[in-house]
Regions:
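Surface-exposed, low-hydrophobicity beta-strand/loop segments enriched in small/polar/acidic residues
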Residues: 1-86
């Protein structure tokens, strides 16, 4: 997979939601040793869903521009807006 980085990577916060620079595609990297729950919300503040991010893993997440991400705890999940192609 080829990715194009569209912004600076930053830590996903447990205290606030982020659209990840209004991203449609997000690279999510978890560098810690414990699993975390990532919650996806809509622009109105309602939860769309959540998933468990395994420790020492990475994934590519597709979302709507106004959807937000938040981690349950910790400072070891990083996100960045990207474009990609297979």
């Amino acid at each position: 997979m080829l990715i194009k980085v569209l912004a600076n990577e930053f830590l996903l916060s447990a205290s606030s939601n982020t659209t990840v620079n209004n991203a449609v595609v997000v690279r999510v990297v978890h560098t810690g040793t414990q699993e975390h729950v990532i919650t996806i919300g809509d622009g109105a503040g309602s939860n769309i869903g959540s998933f468990t991010m395994l420790n020492n893993s990475e994934l590519i997440l597709e979302k709507d521009r106004t959807d937000t991400l938040q981690v349950d705890s910790g400072t070891d999940v990083k996100v960045v807006s990207i474009a990609y192609k297979n």
